[in-house]
């Protein structure tokens, strides 16, 4: 959809997203002729995960390539999280804990964390794994979140903020903090 001209057109794409429970197409960002999409991906045997793909913008066809896949895949249609934000050369993403609770405290698994990668999918060398958190997966920026469905770069202080759905009304809003644990 072109919001100026009100014209619409269909674009072919190779994105294989799965509509399951709370999953499907989860977020999209456009910058410098690229699109990043977070989505729920079928990983086989009834298991799904939050994935991020990138494509060069074309009016005819989008050839998406996965640049991140949350592991492990889980047999659940809940809490994909999956919002995206770009700050400079970094792409931040939220990964919900998929309804698995304590998995958010395990830095060797992606669910329940904030992810930080470069916009091309490569891993920043100043992520927590390389600065004293050697047991953390290299893409993880922060752990201990439940179902973060908001993620944004503040124009006021240039920080990344997230909103997190808590259980039974325990929603909260806070800053994404490198190497920290929000405690879910």
Residue ranges and their predicted role:
Residues 1-102, 150-166:
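Acidic, Gly/Ser/Thr-rich repeat motifs that build Ca2+-stabilized beta-propeller blades
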